[in-house]
Structure formats: structure tokens, C-alpha cells
Amino acid sequence: MNKKLAGIFAMCALLLTGCQGAKESSKEITPPDTGWGKTVDEVLADWNLDRDQVEIFSETESAAAIAVDTEATVFGEQTSRVMFQFINLDQTGATGKPVLCEVDITYPDDADMDTVKKEMEKSYGSSKDSITRYELYQSLGDDQLPEYTYKKADQLAVWSGESLKDAIPSDKSTEYETAWEAYQPGLTADNWESYTEQTSMATAVCASGAEAFPMFEKNGVSLEAYPGLVYEQVKSNMK
């Protein structure tokens, strides 16, 4: 892994302290009122916000994180914070800016999360049984894929979009694997097939109870599309 990508992964770890034509139950996972792959300024424009209306935690050529604390209504309920996270996947350093890869929404403790869940079901279909996400950093000395699986429960609903395995042409799988290793710590030729089977272009989570999802103390929604952005970047690099 080159030093630039290692730096990006480290920054993302700190910032996190976080298909077209698919069936009804697998609708494309899109962020509210904006789109994946958009820059900070494009997301702000979509949300009709100026820079002085948001908290900018970090903004570099590699990554960015901004928060909106204006009690915006998202999925039918008022929020207490909306966090947007951005990453630059261009390895050459010649082009590219950080683009939207994750949205994490915190709701007040008294928010009606049943309403939030129903609104998400309208957009994304029925909850899946489970989803798997992969972190962009590893514990010191750990060479395994940093893999986390979240299962549907009374206080947790999960959604996923198109699987990576379905998106990658079978005759190009080896080429994608070689390129993808630079973007995913712990990825090897040996675990590539399993990774593609479990990885979705984008995922979403709706948590409605204490410790239902590690990122939130209680109520929250997390949407993440890092794999989908890497897929588009790798595909573009192959042209």
C-alpha cells in the first residue's frame, strides 16, 4: 500500500471516532438530498448551506469531514447532527478531490425511529438480514480484513445495494483484485472472492436503541458507499 493511501486510511479512522435495476428489496442506497461522489461544495449546495453554517472538522486534499447541527429533517424526523465524510481516491495526486463516501445521522433520544425506518424502507426496500462493512484501518500487527457484520434485530434495520461480485465482470476479477488491494487493508487474492460476495456498493443502517449500533449512543442512521466509489475509481483507471 502506498504512503498516500495509508495516510488517507489513518485520517478516515480519526474522522470516524465511521443499483440500478435492482429488486425492490435491494434498491440503490443513496444519501438524502445529495449524491455519492460529490465534493464538499457540491454537497453544501445540495443542502442549501454555506460554509459558515457547518462545522468543518477537517478538510485536506485527502479527506474531509463536515457536520450540520441545524436540526434538519431527514427521513421524516428532526436530527441533532448530520456528519458528511469525504475521501479522495485518486492515487496519482494529479487530479481529484475528496468526495462523499459516508453520511452519519444522529437523532435525539425522543425521535420516532419507526418513522425513520419506514421512510428508509420507502427509499431502500425491506431490511436485509445482515450487512458487512470493512474498515479502512487495522489494529497494529493485524493483517486480517477488518470485517464487521451487523444483523437485523428489533432495534436495528440494515440495507445493502448491489453486491461487488455482481458488478465486477468475471473475466476482469483478477485485475480488479490487484488494483483493489491498494484501497482495502487486509485484502489478498486468497480472501478476494469472499470479500466480493459480502461487500455491497453501499449499505445503510437504522439504529433505534442504546448500543444497537457501535457508532451511536442510541438513535442514528449510517449510510456508506466506499466500495462503490472504489469500484468506479478502479474501473476508470482501467480505461
Can you say where each PLM-predicted feature lies in the sequence?
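Non-cytosolic coordination micro-motifs
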Residues: 23-65, 102-239
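Compositionally biased P/S/T/G-rich terminal and signal peptide-adjacent segments
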Residues: 42, 48, 52-95
